[in-house]
C-alpha cells in the first residue's frame, strides 16, 4: 500500500511540474510558429524535450541527477517561461473542431482522429499494460535508465552500453524516474510519434499539398512496422526520423521568413538529434549543411553565421554532455570507436572485426540490394516503400536541375538535397547488413536494416508527396490516385497485423505474438480501444463550450481516472513482474535463484553476463547489477570480476549470440573451480558465487 501511495503522490508533483513546463513552453512556441494546432503542438514538444535534456545534463554534470531535483527544475523552467513570455492574443489555434467544416475537411479530420486514436490504443494495450519485451529495450534502453535512477549518476558505467547518447532515454526517465517501477516506460515514443505526424503535416503544408494528401502521407509514414514496434518499445530510430523532419521543417520556416527570427526550434531539433545515437550525427550534419548552403545563397554570410552559431550552441547544450562524458571517461567522444591518428584507442574494431563492411557502401552488392528492397517492401509496406524509392530517385534531377533553373521551386530543391544527403548517410551507416562479419544477420531479420533507414524513408516520403502535389493536372491526379490506393492497402495490412489476423510483415507479427495472449484478444480490444479514444476526442472537440462551463468537474474526473490508472499499473507491475519474466525465460524467479545462491541476507552485487538482463534489476530496481561491455580473453574476464567485485555471476551455459561477447565466462568458471562455487539453475543459466565472497560471509567479525 505504501508503494501505491508513493506513486500517487509522485503523480501530483509530476502533473504540476509538467503542467507548468508545457504551458510555459507553449507560450514560447507561440512566438515562433503559425497559429495552427499541429504547428503549436510540434513546437511545444520540441521545447519540452529540450528542457528535459538541458535539466538532465546540468544536474548530471553537477552530480545532482535525482528525480526530485529533475522534476522541480522542470517546474522552475516552466514558471520562468510563463513569466517571461506573455500569452498570445490571437486565441486558440485553428483546427480544433471536427464537424463544422466541409465534407472533405470533415473526412480529413475524422481520419486524423482515427489515426491518432489507433496509435494511442496501440500504446495503451501493448506498451503500458504489458511488460517490455523488445530485445534492445531489455538489453540497454531500460537498464540505462534504471542505473541512472539507482545511482543518481548520469556518468555511471554499469550498463554495457553506458556510452550511447541518451536523449531518447531521458524521455523514458521523464516518465518513470519518480515512480516505484517502470510501468509508464511504454509511453516513451508515443509523443515522439505524434511529433512525427505533426512535422510531416507541417512540412507538406509548406509545399502546399492538399489536406487529403497530407493525411495520406501521415498514414503512409505511421503504418509501418518501425513505428508500430517502436511505439511500444524504447528504441530510438523513430526519434531520429522525427527530429530530422522537425529540423528540416523549422529550418525552412526560418529561411522562408527571410530570417527575421533566430532559428531556435530548428537548432533545438539539431541538438536533440545529435544526442539520440551515433548514426544520427550524419543526418544532423546533412540538415546543417543544406540549410547553410541555402542561407548563404539567399542571405549571405551573415545568415549562414547565424545559423551555424545557433546549431553549435544547441549541439553543445543538448548533446555535449554525452560526448564530453565519453571523452572524459574513455578518451574518445565516440567510444568505443576511436581515432588512432588522434591518439584515441579504437576498441570498436576489436569488438566488431570487419564492421566496415557492414555498410551498404562497402559491403553492398546486387544480391544484398535485392534482399534489402524486399525487406523495405515487407517492413514498411507498399506506399512507404514506393514513396521512399520515388523520393530518392526524383531527388537527383530536382536537386541538380532546379537548383539553377527554377528558383521558385526552392522548397522542392531543399527537400531533394536533404533526401540525397540522407541517402548517403544510410549507405554509410554501420550494421545495416550485419553485426558479425559474413553472417548478414541484420539483413536476414529485415526489420533492423529498415529501421536504420527510417529517417530516410520519412524525408523521402515528404519529398514524394510534395512532388506529386506540384505536378498539377492529369498526371498529378493519376499519381494521387495511385498513392491513395497504396496507402489504403498499407493501412489495411498493418491494421490486420495489429489485430492478429495475418502474418504480414513477418518480424512485426513475431513481436505481436510475444505481446498479445492470443489473436482473439487483439481482434476485440484493439479496434474497441481505438473507437473509444476517438469518441472521447470527438466529444471533447465538439463540447468545448460545456467543458469551459464545467472545467472543475471535468478536471476532477480526469484526475480520478489518472489516479486509478496509476494505482492499477503500480500494483500489477510489482505483483506479476517476476513471474512474467521467469515464464518468458523458462527459469525460476531471480529472487529464488539469488536466495539459493547467497549464504547471508545481504543484497548482493550481481554481474550479468548475458544480453537482456533488465528483469534481473527487479520490479523496484532494487538489485545492484552490472553488465560488462566486452571480455575477449580469459584475462579480461578475470579483470572485470576483479574490478566489479560481484557477489553473484549470472551467465548462459553457452553464449549463442552472434557476437559471442560472453562466450568465455562459463569457460572461466568451469576451468577455475577453486575460485567459484558453481550452481546450475534452470537449464540455460549458470550461477556462480566467488569463493572469497562466500568465505567473507562465513567469517565472524
What are these regions (language model features)?
Residues 1-99, 480-513, 522-533:
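Membrane-embedded, hydrophobic transmembrane alpha-helices
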Residues 21-22, 195-201, 292, 370-423, ...:
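Hydrophobic, aromatic-rich transmembrane alpha-helices
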Residues 120-123, 280-281, 483-543, 553-584:
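Transmembrane alpha-helical segments
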Residues 584, 588, 592-629, 646-657:
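Short periplasmic/luminal acceptor-recognition loop of GT-C membrane glycosyltransferases, typified by
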Amino acid at each position: 500500500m505504501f508503494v501505491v501511495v508513493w506513486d500517487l503522490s509522485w503523480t501530483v508533483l509530476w502533473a504540476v511540474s509538467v503542467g507548468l513546463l508545457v504551458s510555459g513552453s507553449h507560450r514560447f512556441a507561440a512566438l515562433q510558429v503559425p497559429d495552427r494546432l499541429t504547428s503549436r503542438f510540434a513546437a511545444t514538444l520540441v521545447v519540452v524535450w529540450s528542457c528535459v535534456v538541458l535539466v538532465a545534463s546540468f544536474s548530471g554534470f553537477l552530480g545532482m541527477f535525482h528525480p526530485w531535483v529533475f522534476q522541480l527544475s522542470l517546474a522552475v523552467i516552466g514558471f520562468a517561461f510563463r513569466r517571461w513570455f506573455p500569452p498570445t492574443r490571437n486565441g486558440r489555434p485553428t483546427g480544433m473542431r471536427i464537424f463544422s467544416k466541409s465534407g472533405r475537411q470533415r473526412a480529413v479530420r475524422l481520419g486524423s482522429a482515427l489515426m491518432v486514436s489507433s496509435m494511442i490504443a496501440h500504446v495503451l494495450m501493448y506498451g503500458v499494460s504489458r511488460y517490455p519485451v523488445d530485445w534492445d529495450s531489455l538489453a540497454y534502453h531500460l537498464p540505462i535508465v534504471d542505473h541512472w535512477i539507482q545511482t543518481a549518476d548520469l556518468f555511471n558505467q554499469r550498463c554495457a552500453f553506458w556510452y550511447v547518447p541518451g536523449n531518447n532515454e531521458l524521455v523514458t526517465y521523464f516518465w518513470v524516474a519518480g515512480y516505484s517501477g517502470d510501468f509508464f516506460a511504454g509511453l516513451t515514443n508515443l509523443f515522439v510519434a505524434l511529433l512525427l505526424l505533426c512535422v510531416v503535416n507541417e512540412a507538406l503544408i509548406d509545399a502546399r499539398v492538399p489536406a487529403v494528401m497530407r493525411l495520406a502521407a501521415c498514414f503512409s509514414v505511421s503504418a509501418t512496422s518501425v513505428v508500430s514496434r517502436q511505439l511500444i518499445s524504447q528504441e530510438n530510430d523513430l526519434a531520429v526520423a522525427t527530429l530530422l523532419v522537425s529540423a528540416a521543417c523549422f529550418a525552412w520556416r526560418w529561411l522562408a521568413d527571410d530570417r527575421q527570427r533566430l532559428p531556435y526550434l530548428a537548432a533545438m531539433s539539431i541538438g536533440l538529434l545529435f544526442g539520440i545515437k551515433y548514426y544520427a550525427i550524419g543526418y544532423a550534419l546533412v540538415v546543417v549543411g543544406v540549410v547553410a548552403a541555402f542561407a548563404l545563397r539567399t542571405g549571405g554570410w551573415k545568415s549562414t553565421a547565424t545559423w551555424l552559431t545557433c546549431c553549435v550552441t544547441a549541439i553543445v547544450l543538448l548533446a555535449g554532455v554525452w560526448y564530453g562524458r565519453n571523452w572524459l571517461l574513455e578518451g574518445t567522444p565516440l567510444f568505443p570507436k576511436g581515432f588512432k591518428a588522434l591518439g584515441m584507442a579504437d576498441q570498436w574494431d576489436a569488438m566488431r572485426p570487419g564492421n566496415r563492411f557492414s555498410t551498404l557502401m562497402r559491403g553492398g552488392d546486387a544480391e544484398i540490394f535485392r534482399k534489402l528492397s524486399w525487406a523495405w517492401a515487407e517492413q514498411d509496406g507498399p506506399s512507404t516503400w514506393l514513396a521512399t524509392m520515388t523520393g530518392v530517385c526524383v531527388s537527383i534531377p530536382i536537386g541538380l536541375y532546379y537548383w539553377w533553373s527554377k528558383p521558385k521551386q526552392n522548397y522542392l530543391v531543399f527537400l531533394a538535397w536533404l533526401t540525397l544527403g540522407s541517402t548517403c548517410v544510410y549507405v554509410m551507416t554501420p550494421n545495416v547488413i550485419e553485426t558479425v562479419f559474413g553472417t548478414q544477420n541484420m539483413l536476414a531479420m529485415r526489420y533492423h536494416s529498415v529501421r536504420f533507414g527510417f529517417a530516410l524513408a520519412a524525408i523521402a516520403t515528404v519529398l514524394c508527396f510534395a512532388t506529386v502535389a506540384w505536378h498539377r493536372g492529369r498526371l498529378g491526379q493519376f499519381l494521387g490516385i495511385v498513392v491513395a490506393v497504396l496507402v489504403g492497402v498499407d493501412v489495411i495490412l498493418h491494421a490486420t497485423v495489429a489485430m492478429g489476423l495475418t502474418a504480414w510483415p513477418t518480424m512485426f507479427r513475431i513481436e505481436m505474438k510475444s505481446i498479445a495472449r492470443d489473436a482473439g484478444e487483439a481482434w476485440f480490444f484493439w479496434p474497441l480501444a481505438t473507437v473509444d479514444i476517438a469518441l472521447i476526442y470527438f466529444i471533447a472537440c465538439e463540447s468545448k463550450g460545456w467543458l469551459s462551463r464545467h472545467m472543475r468537474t471535468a478536471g476532477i474526473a480526469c484526475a480520478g481516472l489518472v489516479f486509478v490508472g496509476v494505482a492499477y499499473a503500480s500494483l500489477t507491475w510489482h505483483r506479476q513482474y517476476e513471474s512474467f519474466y521467469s515464464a518468458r525465460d523458462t527459469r525460476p524467479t531471480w529472487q529464488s535463484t539469488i536466495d539459493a545462491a547467497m549464504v547471508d541476507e545481504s543484497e548482493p552485487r550481481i554481474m550479468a553476463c548475458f544480453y537482456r538482463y533488465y528483469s534481473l534489476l527487479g520490479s523496484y530496481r532494487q538489485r545492484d547489477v552490472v553488465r560488462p561491455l566486452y571480455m575477449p580473453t580469459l584475462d579480461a574476464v578475470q579483470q572485470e570480476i576483479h574490478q566489479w567485485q560481484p557477489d553473484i555471476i549470472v551467465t548462459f551455459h553457452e553464449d549463442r549470440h552472434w557476437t559471442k561477447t560472453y562466450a568465455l565466462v562459463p569457460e572461466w568458471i568451469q576451468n577455475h573451480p577453486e575460485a567459484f562455487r558453481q550452481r546450475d539453475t534452470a537449464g540455460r543459466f549458470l550461477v556462480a558465487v566467488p569463493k572469497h565472497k562466500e568465505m567473507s560471509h562465513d567469517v565472524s567479525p
